[in-house]
């Protein structure tokens, strides 16, 4: 295997977000944060496959489950995940790319930080 899988619980208000990190077996530079669209969870086959592919090519990849349709809630969840990565001290990344799959067609929304 070209990467290691680590399960996480990320603080989000008075709850915890379920998350999985795929950590490449080489030095980290950039990370990618993925979540599902309005339905499903982080274990959707296309998210798992994408995360595995990215990690096998040297990208740190974190996917998480974010229940709820409210966009403000989802943005706060992304911010909590990003803050966790920045403050945990475990993962030193030069930058992070955020992505979300929406709809049946797997259309991707993304931004980078």
What kind of feature is each model-predicted range?
Residues 96-112:
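Glycine-rich nucleophile elbow surrounding the catalytic serine of serine-hydrolase chemistry
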Residues 1-2:
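Plant-biased recognition of short, low-complexity, intrinsically disordered N-terminal tails
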Residues 7-95:
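Serine-hydrolase catalytic machinery in alpha/beta-hydrolase-like enzymes
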Residues 47-49, 110-113:
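Short, glycine/charged-enriched secondary-structure capping and boundary segments
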